[in-house]
Regions:
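Iron-sulfur cluster-binding electron-transfer modules in prokaryotic oxidoreductases
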Residues: 1-167
Length: 167
C-alpha cells in the first residue's frame, strides 16, 4: 500500500519524497470519515441492512480500523453489528487462496461462522482479495461489498430521493 511507500526507499535519495507521499495518501474510508463535508446519504434499500465489517489485513496493518466502522455506523438504513474476530484474516491474502486452497477454505469457514453469528446480511470490506474469498466462502444470501460500493449506493439513493421530492 502507498502508506508504506517511504520504507521502499529507505536510505535512498528518494526516501524523503516517498515519505511525504505516504503521509498524504488516504484510504477512502479515512477521507470520508475525516472530511468536514458530508454528502447527503439515504438508505440504499427499502429494508434495513444488518451490516458487519471485515478488516482486511493490509488496511489493519496501515492503522485504518476505526474509520470504516464509523462510516457504516452513520449510514441511514444500516444496523451495524461487529462480528466476532472481525480482524481475523479471511484466507484470501492476495494469491494465498490459490497457493494453499485447502488452508484458505478452513480459514474462510471460521469467518463464515463469525458472519453467521453476527446475523449480518451484508459484509463490507476494503480489500478486493477479501471480497473474492468472502463471496465464495459465505452463504449466497449474505452480500459482500467494498465499503466504497456501500457509500456510493447511499449517496445515489439520496440523490434519487432528492430528485423525487423536487418533482
Amino acid at each position: 500500500m502507498l502508506k508504506d511507500y517511504g520504507t521502499l526507499f529507505a536510505g535512498e535519495p528518494e526516501q524523503s519524497a516517498a515519505e511525504a507521499l505516504a503521509r498524504r495518501v488516504k484510504h477512502i474510508a479515512e477521507f470520508v470519515a475525516q472530511s468536514a463535508v458530508q454528502p447527503a446519504m439515504a438508505p440504499a434499500a427499502e429494508s434495513q441492512h444488518r451490516v458487519t465489517y471485515h478488516s482486511s489485513c493490509h488496511l489493519r496493518a496501515a492503522g485504518v480500523t476505526k474509520e470504516p466502522r464509523a462510516i457504516l455506523k452513520k449510514l441511514p438504513g444500516v444496523e451495524y453489528v461487529e462480528m466476532p474476530d472481525a480482524d481475523r484474516c479471511a484466507g484470501g491474502a492476495g494469491t494465498y487462496l490459490v497457493k494453499d486452497f485447502d488452508t484458505s477454505q478452513r480459514i474462510v469457514a471460521r469467518k463464515r461462522e463469525a458472519v453467521e453469528s453476527s446475523g449480518a446480511t451484508l459484509v463490507a470490506t476494503s480489500c478486493p482479495a477479501c471480497m473474492i474469498q468472502l463471496k465464495t466462502g459465505l452463504p449466497p444470501d449474505v452480500e459482500v461489498k467494498h465499503i466504497a460500493q456501500v457509500l456510493q449506493e447511499s449517496y445515489e439513493a439520496a440523490r434519487r430521493r432528492a430528485g423525487e421530492t423536487a418533482s
